[in-house]
């Protein structure tokens, strides 16, 4: 017969601790969270870039119309 009994616990494997819930991984770096400790952020200032974009779009549309009329 075996010298170890099935009913005796040897203490090699202690009982696991009580879990408080499933493990949640932290969000990736830079991901906004609901943590309000970083709420002191300076306001963002926007700057006008002028009307260069609008002029460029109008020039492109005129160029397309001229090419369409020529060919």
From Swiss-Prot:
Transmembrane parts of this sequence: 48-64
Disulfide linkage: none
Induction field: Induced by heat in roots, but suppressed in shoots. Accumulates in response to cold, drought, oxidation stress and salt.
Bilayer disposition of the protein: Single-pass membrane protein
Family (UniProt): Belongs to the CYSTM1 family.
Subunit structure of this chain's protein: Heterodimers. Interacts with CYSTM6, CYSTM7, CYSTM12 and WIH1/CYSTM13.
Role of this protein: Involved in resistance to abiotic stress.
UniProt name for this protein: Protein CYSTEINE-RICH TRANSMEMBRANE MODULE 4
Organism: Arabidopsis thaliana (Mouse-ear cress)
Gene name of the record: CYSTM4
């Amino acid at each position: 017969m075996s010298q170890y009994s099935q009913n005796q616990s040897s203490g090699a494997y202690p009982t696991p601790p009580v879990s408080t819930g499933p493990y949640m991984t932290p969000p990736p770096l830079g991901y906004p969270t609901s943590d309000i400790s970083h709420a002191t952020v300076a306001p963002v200032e926007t700057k006008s870039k002028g009307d260069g974009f609008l002029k460029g779009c109008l020039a492109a549309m005129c160029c397309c119309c001229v090419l369409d009329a020529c060919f």
